Amino acid sequence: MSYRELIAELAREHAEEFSDALLELGALSVSVEDADADTPDEQPLFGEPGLTPDRTAWQRSRVIALLAPEHEPAVLLTAAANEIGLPAAPSFTVREVEDQDWVRLTQSQFDPIKIGERIWVVPSWHDAPDPEALVLELDPGLAFGTGSHPTTRLCMEWLEQSVQPEQSVLDYGCGSGILAILAKKCGANPVYGIDIDPQAVESARHNSERNRAEVIYGLPDECPTGEFDIVVANILSNPLKLMASMLTSKVKPGGKIALSGILARQADEVAQVYSRWIDISVWREHEGWVCLSGTRRESH
């Protein structure tokens, strides 16, 4: 008998408690999504660097629970509703999840990705399509960034066009390390990667070793005090605005900065914050996301 997914929609105030109750009652896993994702009502949620977000669910939240074959969805749903004091169980749907070779299936979903003119991001179970290209060996993992997301792609294309040999580069919010590794392969030196998540830092170090790219990684309090020829930050618009003074202070006068993780509708607001120090504009847009790029004005 196959596994099943139980899918229910709940209001924001109940989603987290309901998810916890499902796990306590035996659900194998539970995820919460924005029920309005990919619509005009989509609500991005994020926390400031180092802080827990003040909301952990959406106005209309979709709770998805994976159930073992022996679990009856309606019974589990009713029990979870009773557990958190809901007057009635929410409506739900169920879909079958066929058991299969999950490792092979996962690998089949990640093919080599070509980015820009000569960049290939290649999972370890694939051969590089073009050995003469800039090849980054990277497996999907816990840290964000394999080149498939528009913001990562935009930053990679920008780095390919912008990095000159022996320029210093800071990747702030490095995630998997993909941008720092690419900068190194483009000839940058030295290259630093900073992230607030220790797990991301460890993942980035592992990826750099695999790619034989010498990058220095650390947490924010380990960020170098000097200035860099290039600073790149692929985070989110609100943290980027909050960190504008700090990030621009890391750019040498005449140096360049690239910012992404910004929706097209947020571009003007972010650019306005950085315009105090940087001559900045939209460099490129892709699938509703933008990369802002600019040059730090010379000191007078």
From Swiss-Prot:
Origin superkingdom: Bacteria
An example molecular function term from Gene Ontology annotations: protein-lysine N-methyltransferase activity
Compartment annotation: Cytoplasm
Annotated positions binding S-adenosyl-L-methionine: 152, 173, 195, 234
A GO cellular-component term linked to this record: cytosol
Catalysis: reaction(s): L-lysyl-[protein] + 3 S-adenosyl-L-methionine = N(6),N(6),N(6)-trimethyl-L-lysyl-[protein] + 3 S-adenosyl-L-homocysteine + 3 H(+)
Keywords: Cytoplasm, Methyltransferase, S-adenosyl-L-methionine, Transferase
Name by which UniProt lists this protein: Ribosomal protein L11 methyltransferase
Protein's organism: Paraburkholderia phytofirmans (strain DSM 17436 / LMG 22146 / PsJN) (Burkholderia phytofirmans)
